[in-house]
């Protein structure tokens, strides 16, 4: 069976029925689509690797999508690794999403690791989201709604606490000084002069 008879992109030894009919794309061997594609849409159906990359090197090897994509959307559905990264290195290897994302949304659904991190290193490894990505500014609205009444209560109780401390201090000074001096002029017990 001939391959790419319309454009001659693949060599005569290639026996795949589906070929990319653009001269800039070529298949190096029959068993796997290797090398990057500049503007032909990437590897169409080579080992399950779908989705093309603009100028980032394409898919490294069929069955294992390696290397990052600049701005082409990354690897579509290569081994469960979904979602592309702008300029953070993309998905390290299909089946194990490694490396952090700057501001592109992180790893979509790679082994349970969901949500992106802005500058904390992204998702370290699939199956465990990095705990350092949680920040107080990124708290959920429900948590913020629960914290607001507590903060208001603390603000209201602060003057009452100060007044109570001042009252207790005055009572202590009055007890120590006796009737020889009033609490206003008797600041410390050492200055009190008791009548003999």
UniProtKB/Swiss-Prot annotation:
Keyword set includes Repeat = yes
Positions annotated as sequence repeat: 14-17, 20-23
Task: List the residue ranges of the region (2 X 4 AA repeats of C-C-X-P).
Answer: 14-23
UniProtKB keywords: Keratin, Repeat
| One GO location term (cellular component) | intermediate filament
**Complexes and interactors:** Interacts with hair keratins.
* Protein family according to the UniProt entry: Belongs to the KRTAP type 5 family.
Report the protein's function. Answer: In the hair cortex, hair keratin intermediate filaments are embedded in an interfilamentous matrix, consisting of hair keratin-associated protein (KRTAP), which are essential for the formation of a rigid and resistant hair shaft through their extensive disulfide bond cross-linking with abundant cysteine residues of hair keratins. The matrix proteins include the high-sulfur and high-glycine-tyrosine keratins.
Q: What is this protein called?
A: Keratin-associated protein 5-3
Q: Which organism is it from?
A: Mus musculus
């Amino acid at each position: 069976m001939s391959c790419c008879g319309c454009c001659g992109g693949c060599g005569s030894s290639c026996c795949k029925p589906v070929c990319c009919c653009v001269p800039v794309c070529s298949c190096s061997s029959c068993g796997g689509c290797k090398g990057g594609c500049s503007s032909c849409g990437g590897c169409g159906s080579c080992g399950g690797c779908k989705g093309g990359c603009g100028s980032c090197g394409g898919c490294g090897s069929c069955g294992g999508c390696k290397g990052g994509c600049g701005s082409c959307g990354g690897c579509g559905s290569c081994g469960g690794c979904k979602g592309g990264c702008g300029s953070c290195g993309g998905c390290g290897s299909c089946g194990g999403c490694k490396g952090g994302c700057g501001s592109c949304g992180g790893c979509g659904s790679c082994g349970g690791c969901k949500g992106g991190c802005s500058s904390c290193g992204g998702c370290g490894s699939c199956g465990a989201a990095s705990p350092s990505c949680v920040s107080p500014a990124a708290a959920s609205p429900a948590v913020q709604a629960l914290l607001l009444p507590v903060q208001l209560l603390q603000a209201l109780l602060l003057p009452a606490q100060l007044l109570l401390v001042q009252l207790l201090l005055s009572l202590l000074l009055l007890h120590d000084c006796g009737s020889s001096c009033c609490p206003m002029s008797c600041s410390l017990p050492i200055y009190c002069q008791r009548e003999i």
